[in-house]
């Protein structure tokens, strides 16, 4: 309940962790701050000739051709998560992330960016890697090993990030580990000091 939480602003993308369709994101703005927030794109609700009870809602109203079905899935996703004890599912996912983090760091001769605790590790882990060609590495993982995973440059570093959802298992992480190990042995894409 965001109003009882007392948040000024709160936004969430629900498509990954709540398994709703892409585009199902929400924005909550405390009434005290609604006048300060203008939409990036305006549509028919902006300066409407027939305003509703809320100029904030009017200003953020989207075009009539927008498909709202993704947003309408959010309540059912919350119901699904409650029904299937998603707190326990998420905890098991975090445990799987944490139990593999050091193994991957050792493989690429790296260190975790933060302590391996629930305060820092949710359902994903970014492994600092040394590569001069992150795009080629990402493409190789996909083309040869059929693994879709972010290989992301950030500043002067590159990160390989895995994430775990309810449908992932240790076998998936073993497949990734074996692929990275093979790439280290057969290419010069990942540098090991």
What are these model-predicted stretches?
Residues 5-50:
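Active-site PLP attachment segment
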Residues 16, 63, 165:
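Glycine- and other small-residue-rich loops at beta-strand/loop junctions that grip anionic moieties
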Residues 21, 119-121, 156-158:
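Short acidic/glycine-enriched loop/turn segments that link adjacent beta-strands
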